């Protein structure tokens, strides 16, 4: 539709699988599953619900008569009761026991939890794929020296693969958070208007033991281990905040990754994928802009800010419930998951297609490494009997002169030639070139990468060996 606003997260960025989870069809089919679980639990606990009624509900769990529900909602202005009515039209024998003892939050809140849980499983799957892709990259480039940067100024070299482990480590931390959230997932259950289960105590004629069993049965039928032990009318809105905090952390990790790629692309050391017919600029035809990484950064900023919504909502809920959560969470929660889905698709796409330019990396090392090697050069000369303080002064003078050539004349770094021509050092240019072999300055970076991949990453990937390997397709 060209005359109606559509969220770009749905129309442009997120995958079909994630979009379906937050669709009306998913929501209303889950409502029906919950009504079936409630009726079946009530039947098993001895309430006047028959197997015939339960079977009738199950027979129409999927074929929702949306037109009937929508017409009814225009009349009664209540979405839950409209769908109770529509379900009852299809299930006349069960119409009288649909939603028995429940409140709107029984279907609404439990459905929200189920959808968020399933959405988090998609996030988990894609996080694992991000880690898998980056592990291949780190393994391939674990030995390739490159300049490290602190304050975005050249620093002691690392390796391209070791740098990738830093990105991976943050995504692994995020995966731990996702796993923790999924490990403690629980439903609201059916606790009534203020969380006291008064309606069920009435249905069971004051039998506390029977009323207390309803939640456990519902949880089991819906595939959960438990429900919240206590609640008001709703599940604690802090759950939404915790969920979106996890997504915010993923966004932070992705933004860090994308910013590094953008800077590396500026240096022409590493580039994100660039399609054969892709246009970087409408005016500057030669440009290769890192638009995927820029989109990651843009969406990440949105998620980090969006995560404030449920935090503020949770902190401003009154007593057993207020409705000022509803409109906000209808927007903030789905959009956060859709944006995270989009980000992880982009990270997979970028990481899987990174292009490394070793010759450019080598050129940058040649320009900077002589300065970093001067301490080793001084120590070698001192061991041969030269005065350390004189050596230091000569290095300082030569370094300033070489730096001037680079910065003011645009020339190459000639520090090694200056040192070779200075008799105080007593060393040839060939000997100096051996001293400044970049592999000698990366410390334990290659070994650190190997250990990290074997001891930290491999156990995670082995645990998720059955996780489907994805190749992300994105809209440019």
Please place each PLM-identified region on the residue numbering:
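Long, amphipathic alpha-helical stalk/connector segments used for oligomerization, subunit docking
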Residues: 302-388, 394
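Short, well-ordered beta-strand elements within core beta-sheets of diverse protein domains
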Residues: 162, 241-249, 376-384
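Glycine-rich anion/phosphate-binding loop at the beta-strand->alpha-helix junction
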Residues: 174, 225, 232-326, 330
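Active/binding-pocket-proximal capping segment
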Residues: 271, 394-401
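A helix-coil-helix interface module used to build multimeric assemblies
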Residues: 1-198, 204-219, 280-281, 291-295, ...
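Glycine-rich cofactor-pocket loops
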Residues: 139-161, 271-287, 320-327, 352-372
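Short beta-alpha connecting loops at secondary-structure transitions
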Residues: 19-23, 68-70, 278-298, 320-335, ...
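Amphipathic alpha-helices that form helix-helix packing interfaces
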Residues: 38-41, 123, 127-130, 134-137, ...
